[in-house]
Amino acid sequence: SRGLGDVYKRQALTVYGLPGSVLETYCGTAIPFYPVNSGACGAETAWQYDLDTAALTISGRGPVADFAADVAPWALFDAEIRQVTVEDGVTALPESSFANCTGLSRVTLGSGIEKMDANWFAHCPDLTELTVTAADTVFPAAVFAGVGDGLTLYGYYDTSVMDYARQHGLTFVPLGCLHRIYTDSGPAPTCTAGATRSRTCARCGADLGTVELP
């Protein structure tokens, strides 16, 4: 009987499977083998699903390519994914990116994500922690309609995630301060001379240095 190697020689066979599997060992270097738990998802973006930790990581630079929820590159693992990390260089994700990830509990969005889609978390009843590191991320109406009770939002003081949490009665946990609100103290400039004033964060009291006023 013929093996996969014989088929490959005749039909240029490509094999997809799990890394470290018997199938990968069989293919060796003779037959092209591609893991089903990682790959490209845009011109400069990639995804990887860790089978041991049930964690999906999306990395790279720029937007992820558009796709429907049921054909997302990681759709094979929708029922298994427990946590998602979108790294800072990624700037956009398609509609319904994590819809139907029914066991998803934690998501971290990098600083490049400034707009969320209303269907990202459709049918994600177990989502309990969402970390948003961008300062002005847009939250669509009903973005958490498919999420159960007990959602906690993590983010920085004086950002859109803090405002959203307060407006919707959600628990907010601060990650720190971006020093977006500050006060200046010291002499005021005059008609004939400028002034050097000290700048302090109004939220956390951090010393932000000095500012020269003409």
Positions of predicted regions on the chain:
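Short, exposed beta-strand/loop patches in secreted or surface proteins that constitute
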Residues: 44-51
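Low-complexity, Pro/Thr/Ser/Gly/Ala-rich linker/spacer regions in secreted
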Residues: 30-44, 171-181, 212-214
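Short, intrinsically disordered, charge-balanced linker/junction segments flanking boundaries
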Residues: 1-5, 26, 211-214
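Short, aromatic/basic amphipathic alpha-helical patches
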Residues: 22-32, 143, 160-169
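Acidic/polar low-complexity surface segments
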Residues: 65-77
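Extracellular modular ligand-binding repeats in secreted and cell-surface proteins
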Residues: 87, 133, 176-214
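Consensus positions within tandem repeat domains that build extended binding/scaffold surfaces
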Residues: 94-97, 117-120, 143
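Structural signature of tandem-repeat unit edges
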Residues: 1-5, 10-21, 34-37, 53-62, ...
